């Protein structure tokens, strides 16, 4: 893994629901310490995780942020909701290998974490692995292209 201190810096959106404020705050401090620009788009008291996931994913889809991090209880709901935004590939990250592969094989722009399923230290290690990994292309490129084709065929809900 590349040294996290010498990695490229990104504009990163981050969002969480009420289950994950402590992990989100630790991630913001970690990311800013490494030179990233972080925008907190977390839930307000009247919002649920799908609202946050959509707001964060749209910011990536519009090019306002290059990467994003979403945190809820498991990371699953955030990933499902974020993946509803066209052009977004969000991955739930349970371990460092998955974090690396989410970027290298799937070109995931959004990493989703579960505050109730992974500890803060492990999540920060995974976050570093995800941030220093780049899309490898190669044999994965045609598969990511197929994901984009599936998405474009299904932008209109079938009757």
Stretch-by-stretch model annotation:
Residues 5-15, 19-20, 96-159:
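C-terminal binding/interaction regions
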Residues 13-33, 38:
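Glycine-rich phosphate/diphosphate-binding loop of Rossmann-like nucleotide-binding domains
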Residues 15, 39-42, 68-72:
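Short, conserved beta-strand edge motifs with alternating hydrophobic and charged residues
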Residues 25-28, 80-84, 124:
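Short amphipathic alpha-helical segments
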Residues 34, 86-88, 106:
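Short, structured coil segments at secondary-structure junctions
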Residues 37-49:
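A short beta-strand-loop structural module common to alpha/beta enzyme folds
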Residues 52, 56-93:
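Helix-adjacent hinge/juxtasegments
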């Amino acid at each position: 893994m590349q040294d996290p201190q010498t990695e490229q810096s990104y504009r990163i959106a981050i969002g969480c629901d009420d289950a994950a404020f402590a992990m989100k705050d630790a991630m913001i401090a970690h990311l800013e310490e490494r030179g990233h620009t972080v925008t907190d788009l977390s839930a307000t008291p009247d919002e649920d995780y799908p609202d946050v996931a959509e707001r964060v994913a749209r910011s990536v889809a519009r090019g306002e942020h290059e990467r994003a991090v979403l945190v809820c209880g498991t990371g699953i709901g955030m990933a499902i909701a974020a993946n509803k935004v066209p052009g977004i590939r969000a991955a739930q990250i349970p371990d460092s290998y998955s974090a690396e592969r989410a970027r290298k094989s799937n070109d995931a722009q959004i990493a989703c974490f579960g505050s109730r399923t992974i500890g803060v230290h492990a999540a920060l290690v995974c976050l570093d692995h995800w941030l220093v990994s780049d899309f490898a292309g190669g044999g994965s490129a045609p598969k990511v292209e197929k994901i984009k084709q599936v998405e474009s065929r299904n932008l209109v809900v079938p009757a």
